């Protein structure tokens, strides 16, 4: 499957073959859901915590004698039924991460890239290196396409490109080693460099 390769001036400078095993995979919303949930679970801090009866400060003395008071027996003022007492079965500090099969993760990436390609929201760029800082040039480039947000994925990017995109809220730069399903779906248009296409073919095939 041949698609056009463009430069930073939005000019067609050639063509590239996209492997249909990566860029023309059947749409699988169930796989996308699994991979996105896996990614977001790994990002969770898991710092939620409530105090158990061993964490609550206060006396450990029995509040009153066991019998002959006419009241229910109590062993501690730190028990959950008292104001300021412990929380039973509350959240604890933990990791929410879990493992997901590598084949499923790779399939999710293929489905996400194929989805963008089928919607004409996938562009191939020759290079993302610019030798100067000029936000206006990047702005002119993205204005040629009627998309809301852009994810630019490349092998690496220099300071010129980084600072040129820094002030654009709808443009995100990402190194190819960090290509992931969540960021692809979160942006309207995905821009890959020629090097990134070759990298993805080696990674996913």
Curated annotation (Swiss-Prot):
Stretches the record annotates as Disordered: 56-78
Disulfide bridge map: none
GO molecular function, one term: rRNA binding
Key words, A-Z: Ribonucleoprotein, Ribosomal protein, RNA-binding, rRNA-binding
Gene3D superfamilies: 3.40.1370.10
Pfam families tied to this protein: Ribosomal_L4 (PF00573)
An annotated GO BP: translation
Nucleotide-binding keyword on record: no
Secreted recorded as keyword: no
Cross-referenced SUPFAM superfamilies: Ribosomal protein L4 (SSF52166)
GO cellular component: ribonucleoprotein complex; ribosome
UniProt subunit comment: Part of the 50S ribosomal subunit.
Sequence similarity: Belongs to the universal ribosomal protein uL4 family.
Function: One of the primary rRNA binding proteins, this protein initially binds near the 5'-end of the 23S rRNA. It is important during the early stages of 50S assembly. It makes multiple contacts with different domains of the 23S rRNA in the assembled 50S subunit and ribosome.
Protein's name according to its UniProt entry: Large ribosomal subunit protein uL4
Species name: Ehrlichia ruminantium (strain Gardel)
Lineage: Bacteria, Pseudomonadati, Pseudomonadota, Alphaproteobacteria, Rickettsiales
Gene (name only): rplD
């Amino acid at each position: 499957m041949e698609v056009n390769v463009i430069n930073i001036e939005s000019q067609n400078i050639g063509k590239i073959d996209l492997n249909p095993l990566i860029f023309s995979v059947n749409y699988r919303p169930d796989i996308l859901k699994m991979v996105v949930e896996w990614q977001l679970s790994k990002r969770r801090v898991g710092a939620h915590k409530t105090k158990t009866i061993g964490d609550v400060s206060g006396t450990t003395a029995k509040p009153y004698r066991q019998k002959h008071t006419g009241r229910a027996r109590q062993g501690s003022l730190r028990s959950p039924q008292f104001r300021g007492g412990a929380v039973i079965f509350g959240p604890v500090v933990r990791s929410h991460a879990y493992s997901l099969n590598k084949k499923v993760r790779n399939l999710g990436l293929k489905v996400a890239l194929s989805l963008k390609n089928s919607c004409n929201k996938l562009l191939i760029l020759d290079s993302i290196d610019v030798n100067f800082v000029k936000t206006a040039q990047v702005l002119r480039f993205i204005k040629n396409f009627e998309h809301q947000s852009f994810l630019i994925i490349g092998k690496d990017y220099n300071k010129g490109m980084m600072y040129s995109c820094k002030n654009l809220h709808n443009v995100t730069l990402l190194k190819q080693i960090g290509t992931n399903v969540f960021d692809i779906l979160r942006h309207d248009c995905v821009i890959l460099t020629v090097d990134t296409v070759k990298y993805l073919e080696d990674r996913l095939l």
